[in-house]
A protein has these predicted regions:
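N-terminal small/polar loop signature for handling phosphorylated ligands or for N-terminal nucleophile
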Residues: 1-26, 30-33, 189
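Short acidic, glycine/serine/threonine-rich loops at helix termini
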Residues: 1-4, 23-28, 42-44, 63, ...
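Alpha-helical scaffold elements adjacent to nucleotide-binding pockets in ATP/GTP-utilizing enzyme cores
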Residues: 4, 50-54, 98-101
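Hydrophobic helix-and-loop "lid/oligomerization" segment in the mid-to-C-terminal part
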Residues: 9, 60-201
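Short, glycine/acidic-enriched loop or turn micro-motifs at the edges of active sites
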Residues: 19-20, 35, 90, 145
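Short alpha-helices
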Residues: 26-65, 73-85
Length: 201
């Protein structure tokens, strides 16, 4: 995709937080503090944390041109904080701050899809804590990539349509229930094998 974008004269910026491979795409730039040549001091940000830092940098340069109010970027912290907690990166240094302030924004977030998802769980938005994200919200959002199409999670969180948001919240809730059923089945099967081996020994 990057090579094709280059052919079309497009500049591609890649954000990542995984250990880079030996060969990386020839993008305009790659933001990944795990690269050996990257001077950024904190290399434990999750993917959304890296993307949020890019957003802050872009706004620092283009705020007036884009007519973006000072401090608006804090409203993106709901997604950065949610991802930081759900991705289980170490909650220290910048991650700790992103998670802390992300929870504050998450409790006030106007995102329609998030509100619909919380309603499915009977979870009061104003009372969300770290465990809610890690064990309730995060698994439902992650179910999109594990059991279906990852773009569905984006569509849920980006939706501004009541019916669409409701449908995606239902869909992700169903996917998560299916995932839990599969995990329970796999655990049951593994236990049977272990018990059989124990009897044989």
């Amino acid at each position: 995709e990057v090579a094709r974008a280059n052919e079309l004269g497009m500049d591609v910026i890649i954000t990542d937080h995984h250990l880079p491979q030996d060969v990386v795409p020839k993008a305009y730039t790659i933001l990944n503090s795990k690269q050996a040549t990257d001077p950024y001091p904190d290399n434990m940000l999750c993917g959304a944390g890296v993307a949020w830092k890019l957003s802050c940098a872009l706004l620092a340069r283009r705020r007036e041109a884009w007519s973006v109010p000072v401090g608006w970027e804090k409203w993106l912290l709901d997604m950065a904080g949610l991802s930081t907690i759900a991705d289980m990166v170490p909650l220290k240094n910048e991650n700790r701050a992103i998670a802390y302030f992300g929870l504050k924004v998450l409790r006030k977030s106007p995102r329609l899809g998030l509100k619909k998802l919380l309603a499915k769980m009977d979870m009061p938005q104003a009372n969300i804590v770290e465990d809610d994200v890690g064990f309730m919200i995060g698994p439902r959002i992650n179910a999109a990539s594990r059991m279906g199409n990852p773009i569905d999670a984006f569509r849920l969180l980006a939706s501004t349509d009541e019916r669409e948001a409701e449908e995606f919240a239902d869909h992700l809730t169903h996917l998560n229930e299916t995932r839990k059923g599969l995990v329970a089945s796999m655990v049951k099967e593994a236990r049977k094998h272990l018990e059989a081996r124990a009897r044989d020994n």
